[in-house]
Regions:
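Class I S-adenosyl-L-methionine
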Residues: 1-194
Length: 194
């Protein structure tokens, strides 16, 4: 379990260190979970206690340093109305949770609930077209397409936005990812037919 007070102190320490280096800084990015999720262990349900602890720590730290810490993460958790309420409450406190999707249908579902979405793709241009066909705007992750761009400069994933961020899958895991996405899409398609 995460200790909210320790997390708040850690966030403040990091914020003060960054502000000492650059006092005119207008935002500090905090990404929770480079790997992992915010689910209750062994389930696909959002762990409301974990989310509340993180969001509360960010909110508390921002009261001290002036709303400059932008917290964000990604989740593969099931997105229902209860999860949507948790996600919206966290965003209000400064912790933006992106629905991490593998199909356009998952993106549509998340966006219909007002949740920011990202999607993994083996063909980002094709995914952009698929999103456009259902009335959504997608753009590939700027850090993947712009020389010298990184998450700290972009901060798009930490912002409330209309655009769906497309993460192009590359490298040695592309084949495995393609297969996993195809299996996931096939399962989703079969469930839709029931």
């Amino acid at each position: 379990m995460i200790n909210g007070e320790h997390l708040k102190i850690g966030l403040l320490e990091g914020a003060f260190n960054k502000l000492r280096k650059n006092p005119t800084r207008d935002s500090i990015l905090f990404r929770h979970n480079v790997a992992g999720d915010i689910a209750i262990e062994g389930t696909s349900l959002i762990d409301v206690n974990r989310v509340d602890t993180i969001a509360g720590a960010i909110e508390g730290a921002n009261k001290v340093v002036g709303e400059i810490i932008k917290g964000y993460t990604f989740t593969h958790c099931m997105i229902d109305l209860h999860a949507s309420d948790i996600i919206h409450d966290a965003a209000y406190k400064g912790f933006l949770i992106n629905a991490s999707c593998e199909t356009v249908e998952e993106v549509k579902h998340a966006k219909a609930l007002g949740i920011n979405a990202v999607i993994a793709s083996v063909d980002p241009k094709e995914t952009e077209k698929e999103l456009k066909a259902v009335g959504l705007y997608g753009a590939q992750c700027p850090a993947q397409v712009k020389e010298g761009m990184d998450c700290n400069h972009c901060q798009l994933c930490a912002k409330n936005r209309k655009v769906v961020i497309i993460f192009g899958i590359h490298g040695s895991h592309k084949g495995k990812a393609r297969k996993a996405i195809q299996i996931h899409r096939a399962k989703a398609s079969n469930l839709a037919k029931l």
